[in-house]
């Protein structure tokens, strides 16, 4: 008599993916970070969508909208903290994932490694845009301090900063 997890059509899919996964026996917990990245990204997207439903970007009402989210929205404080700490966890998992790849020599697979580097740069650019463009309390700081890092590039740094800003300086606390 066969086990139900191996004979039932739906349970067979779960069994083959989770229980009887054809993985080497020496696989360690270092290989979990890709899955953790997916979970963190899903949490970021969902909490970001729910937070965006209640957030206003005007300089006079942005702080009040964050206060409204934390006090009046059901579990709004939890959404805010999950979103803030989820970003940190995402990057911790990302750097550990890259570190694991360096440790185990995954850079020898050049096509895969180069695609990962492209994804890393895309994630960092997206995180920067997500930090600067929500048009919230930290936008002014994010736009000035992070982009001023480009001014360290010799000869063209200051021109790059002015080009990214679209002028000499960023104006208000929010970008509206």
Swiss-Prot record:
Binds 2 heme b groups non-covalently. One of its GO terms (biological process) is mitochondrial electron transport, ubiquinol to cytochrome c. Component of the ubiquinol-cytochrome c reductase complex (complex III or cytochrome b-c1 complex) that is part of the mitochondrial respiratory chain. The b-c1 complex mediates electron transfer from ubiquinol to cytochrome c. Contributes to the generation of a proton gradient across the mitochondrial membrane that is then used for ATP synthesis. Heme 1 (or BL or b562) is low-potential and absorbs at about 562 nm, and heme 2 (or BH or b566) is high-potential and absorbs at about 566 nm. It is a multi-pass membrane protein. Keywords: Electron transport, Heme, Iron, Membrane, Metal-binding, Mitochondrion, Mitochondrion inner membrane, Respiratory chain, Transmembrane, Transmembrane helix, Transport, Ubiquinone. Heme b b566 binds at residue 97. Its main location: mitochondrion. The cytochrome bc1 complex contains 11 subunits: 3 respiratory subunits (MT-CYB, CYC1 and UQCRFS1), 2 core proteins (UQCRC1 and UQCRC2) and 6 low-molecular weight proteins (UQCRH/QCR6, UQCRB/QCR7, UQCRQ/QCR8, UQCR10/QCR9, UQCR11/QCR10 and a cleavage product of UQCRFS1). This cytochrome bc1 complex then forms a dimer. It is found in: Mitochondrion inner membrane. The keyword Metal-binding applies. The keyword Zinc-finger does not apply. It comes from the Eukaryota. Heme b b562 binds at residue 83. Belongs to the cytochrome b family. InterPro entries: Cyt_b/b6_N, Cytb/b6-like_sf, Cytochrome_b_N_euk/bac, Di-haem_cyt_TM. The gene is MT-CYB. It comes from Tomopeas ravum (Blunt-eared bat). Its cofactor is heme b. SUPFAM superfamilies: Transmembrane di-heme cytochromes (SSF81342). This is Cytochrome b. GO terms for cellular component: mitochondrial inner membrane. GO terms for molecular function: metal ion binding; ubiquinol-cytochrome-c reductase activity. The chain crosses the membrane at residues 33-53, 77-98, 113-133.
């Amino acid at each position: 008599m066969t086990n139900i997890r191996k004979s039932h059509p739906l349970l067979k899919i779960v069994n083959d993916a989770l229980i009887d996964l054809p993985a080497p026996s020496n696989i360690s917990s270092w290989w979990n970070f890709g899955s953790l990245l997916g979970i963190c990204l899903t949490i970021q997207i969902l909490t970001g969508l729910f937070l965006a439903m209640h957030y206003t970007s005007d300089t006079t009402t942005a702080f009040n909208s964050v206060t409204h989210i934390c006090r009046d929205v059901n579990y709004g404080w939890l959404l805010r903290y999950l979103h803030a700490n989820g970003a940190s966890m995402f990057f911790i998992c990302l750097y550990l994932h890259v570190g694991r790849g360096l440790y185990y020599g995954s850079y020898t697979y050049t096509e895969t490694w180069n695609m990962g580097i492209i994804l890393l740069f895309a994630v960092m650019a997206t995180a920067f845009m997500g930090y600067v463009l929500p048009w919230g309390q930290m936008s002014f700081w994010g736009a000035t301090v992070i982009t001023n890092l480009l001014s360290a590039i010799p000869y063209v740094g200051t021109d790059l900063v002015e080009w990214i800003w679209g002028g000499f300086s960023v104006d208000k606390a929010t970008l509206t």
